[in-house]
């Protein structure tokens, strides 16, 4: 399946483009006000004491700036940043090589930390807690364990699936931050800032139009900005107005809700093939030819957040918003929690279906 334009997952093109527009300081970090304020306090206090910052766990949907925040943490602390990921650290020796090369107070960023192997995770525990590395030398009866002292460091772990972290690992993070989807106002500021760095002429209304269709995700906003820039360069006078952005994004099949063909296919499958649900995620994945993990991590979070899809103990259900989106009448159902299809809106004091 071709890569979606509005997928929140990063690509190599995204990494190269995002590097030039990535903020380096918390003062330039747009959105997530609670996270920003807390990190300003924690970083300032650690810097004033000359100590390593407590280990930080950052979780939330992909594309919201977990990697960016790790870069900012290292930059604000004035230390080096070492980057790795859970799948890459296959053996304890891989982790040991990283840890023994850290300088005091350095930041080690581990993306997809929920994918660490159990044997590597066991080595990480004493490193996080006591700044010590347990190494086993030899094999069998002759094997012996030695301890290596490590410089104080900060582990920044990032994950889209915090629920998959083991309790011992999760409990060793002194700072836990959840990143939320961005509102249109913050995304508009992000688009305007990126356009300024890239030298793109953009009107406020054009930036807002891109922001509205970016699914609350900065990575998608920056990607759409680059594509709309291309359209404006060839089809317009190089200036991104709201009309130019609207035409470009319609051409790219990104509608006013930020949905693309995959979103519409999922919602229609729930409505037409499963009578609005509930439907299990495995059945839904088979119906649309997509992997379960992609549905859970990439497609459905935004649909749920926007109120088009509902996750229940019995499976996924389409909401009245989904029916209205397709111009379909919502069925009258009984026993649906939360008055899903809006019976209370129909007036009368009864509020019954």
Curated annotation (Swiss-Prot):
Reaction catalyzed: ATP + H2O = ADP + phosphate + H(+)
Main location: cytoplasm
Positions contributing to DNA binding: 292, 311, 316
Root EC class: hydrolase
GO biological process, one term: DNA repair
InterPro entries in alphabetical order: AAA+_ATPase, AAA_lid_4, DNA_helicase_Holl-junc_RuvB, P-loop_NTPase, RuvB-like_N, RuvB_C, WH-like_DNA-bd_sf, WH_DNA-bd_sf
Region span, Large ATPase domain (RuvB-L): 1-182
Keyword Hydrolase: yes
Ranges in coiled-coil conformation: none
GO cellular component: cytoplasm; Holliday junction resolvase complex
Chain segments carrying region Small ATPAse domain (RuvB-S): 183-253
Region (Head domain (RuvB-H)): 256-353
Residues reported in the UniProt entry to bind ATP: 21-22, 63, 66-68, 129-131, 172, 182, 219
Cellular localization per UniProt: Cytoplasm
PANTHER family linked to this entry: HOLLIDAY JUNCTION BRANCH MIGRATION COMPLEX SUBUNIT RUVB (PTHR42848:SF1), PTHR42848
Purpose of the protein: The RuvA-RuvB-RuvC complex processes Holliday junction (HJ) DNA during genetic recombination and DNA repair, while the RuvA-RuvB complex plays an important role in the rescue of blocked DNA replication forks via replication fork reversal (RFR). RuvA specifically binds to HJ cruciform DNA, conferring on it an open structure. The RuvB hexamer acts as an ATP-dependent pump, pulling dsDNA into and through the RuvAB complex. RuvB forms 2 homohexamers on either side of HJ DNA bound by 1 or 2 RuvA tetramers; 4 subunits per hexamer contact DNA at a time.
Protein name: Holliday junction branch migration complex subunit RuvB
Organism: Thioalkalivibrio sulfidiphilus (strain HL-EbGR7)
């Amino acid at each position: 399946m071709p890569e979606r334009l509005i997928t929140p997952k990063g690509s190599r093109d995204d990494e190269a483009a995002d590097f030039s527009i990535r903020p380096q300081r918390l003062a330039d970090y747009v959105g997530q006000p609670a996270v920003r304020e807390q990190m300003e306090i924690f970083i300032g206090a650690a810097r004033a004491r000359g100590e390593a910052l407590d280990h930080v766990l950052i979780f939330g949907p992909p594309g919201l700036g977990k990697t960016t925040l790790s870069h900012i943490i290292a930059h604000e602390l004035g230390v080096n940043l070492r980057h790795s990921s859970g799948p890459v650290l296959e053996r304890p020796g891989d982790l040991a090589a990283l840890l023994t090369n850290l300088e005091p107070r350095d930041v080690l960023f581990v993306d997809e930390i929920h994918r660490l192997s159990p044997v590597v995770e066991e080595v990480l525990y004493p490193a996080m807690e006591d700044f010590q590395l347990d190494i086993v030398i030899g094999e069998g009866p002759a094997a012996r364990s030695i301890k290596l002292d490590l410089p104080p460091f900060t582990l920044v772990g990032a994950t889209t699936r915090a629920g998959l972290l083991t309790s011992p690992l999760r409990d060793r993070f002194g700072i836990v931050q959840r990143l939320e989807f961005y509102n249109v106002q913050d995304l508009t500021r992000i688009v305007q800032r990126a356009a300024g760095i890239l030298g793109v002429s953009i009107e406020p209304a054009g930036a807002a139009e891109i922001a509205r269709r970016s699914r609350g995700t900065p990575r998608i906003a920056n990607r759409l900005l680059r594509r709309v820039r291309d359209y404006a360069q060839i089809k317009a006078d190089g200036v991104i107005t709201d009309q130019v952005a609207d035409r470009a994004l319609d051409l790219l099949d990104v509608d006013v809700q930020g949905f693309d063909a995959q979103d519409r296919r999922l919602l229609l499958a729930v409505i037409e093939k499963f009578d609005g649900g509930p439907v299990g995620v495995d059945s839904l994945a088979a119906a649309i030819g997509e992997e379960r993990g992609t549905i859970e991590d990439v497609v459905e979070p935004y649909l749920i957040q926007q109120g088009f899809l509902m996750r229940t103990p019995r499976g996924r259900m389409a909401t009245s918003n989904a029916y209205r989106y397709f111009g379909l009448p919502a069925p009258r159902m009984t026993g649906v929690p939360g008055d899903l299809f809006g019976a209370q809106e129909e007036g009368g004091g009864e509020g019954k279906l």
